[in-house]
Amino acid sequence: MNRLHTLIDGFSRVRILCIGDVMLDKFLYGSVSRISPEAPVPIMKMDRETHMLGGAGNVVSNLCALGCRTTFISVVGDDDHGRQVRRFLEETHCVPELVVREGYETTVKIRFVAGKHHLLRADQEQPLNMEPELASRFLERVDACLPEADLVLLSDYGKGLFDGRTAPDVIARCRAARKPVIVDPKGADYSRYRGATDRKS
């Protein structure tokens, strides 16, 4: 037990820069007692609704819960969901370095749950295009935050943040700064992560 306490206490000394796709998770809870007369689908009576960080935002929440000093870089839309993501990140006591892109909708995953049954998931999302101007602003954040980090974590959820040159450019900066970079990848093509210190299998 003392060893575990020592390990957990050590987390508070680690400064982690997490970079990844953030999203908002919504859970709609209710009960089903009948089938719709309009179509053979259940009618759910809504009881309550909860919101939380999803994607790489959930990773950040877990790191902060362990006591890690965490800075988080991602892209959100100039919308209510993006502002809600920022508030949730601030509540975890991480440092949110969010790049806001006008015209982009922050990704939201909506899950409908009745009792123990997950009835449906609805996604509100659009592809994130890391065009040159956005990529430049994003990499400026990376350059500004990198010197203070002990470790860099790339959390790829396949929403466009690491498409194109983004992942190689970030990894090159980490290597130049001699910062270890760990990748939690998405998909089967790992070539974009070449040069990373390690990756989750």
State each model region's role:
Residues 40, 44-47:
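Divalent-cation-assisted or electrostatically stabilized phosphate/pyrophosphate-binding catalytic cores
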